[in-house]
Amino acid sequence: MRTISIKPLRGFEVSIEAEVISPERMAALSLDQIGALAVWLGNRQSLLSDLFLVEGDEAPASPAETLIRLEGDFSRVKRIAEGMSAGTVEVLGDAGMHAGNGMKGGLLSITGSADDWLGREMREGKIVVAGDAGNYVGAGYRGEKCGMRGGEIEISGSAGAYLGEHMCGGSIRVNGDAGDFPGAANQGGTIYIGGSTYLPGAEMTKGAITVKGGTRVLPSYQKAEVVQVEGREFQKYLGDLVENGKGELLVAVS
């Protein structure tokens, strides 16, 4: 396994567009070539080595045999692991917006929290966040009909609003609370929320949402039977009937 370590040389007041931080882009390059990759600091193009210290193993490897370790504050670094299909990206701290955008495989691990649009339109792979995540986790970007189509996202903390909006497949698990309207326009994905949320599944046509904490259910959902899940009772609802939806919503019985 080749390990590449990347550390910020200073703090950043503006965001950095760094979609080059991915095993596909770095695995076959020398450390000097990695440092010469282009990133954007605000509206100015820079070299990766102008902003970050790049260290690690020199020998090239396949993307699947590459680990990229990001150490320090990456909360203003956007598009980490964008489009990756193999290998591992490990963020030892916080990650900026659009982390894991369009992932096709591999593992993105974040020991801190992630900003908005985590796992946007991801296809395959796995994202694990030890902290919290922002809005639009696993969602589709403006104008897109489908968000997440496959893969897994696991968040140990809480998530923001519009969790899994427009998702067409895959699964999202949030152990804490979620913001308003999780699973809005869900078209086939699976969402689990371990805490509370508000108005899940608006305009859902397909898929499943489970809420273990408290929530308010839209009146356009039809109450069905009470089911047992892992020894606990959940009220089952079907909808969203406004969209002739066939989705399933399970809410824990208090």
Regions found by a protein language model. Name each.
Residues G100, G119, V137-G138, G164, ...:
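Short glycine/serine- and acidic-residue-enriched loop/turn motifs that recur at repeat junctions
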Residues L48-S49, E65-K104, S109-D115, G119:
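Surface-facing alpha-helical segments and adjacent helix-coil boundary elements at the starts of domains
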Residues G96, D115, N135-A139, G179:
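Leucine-rich repeat
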Residues V91, A95, M103, I110, ...:
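Fold-core signature of tandem repeat domains
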Residues M1-D73, K78-R79, G83, V128-A130, ...:
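Intrinsically disordered, low-complexity terminal regions
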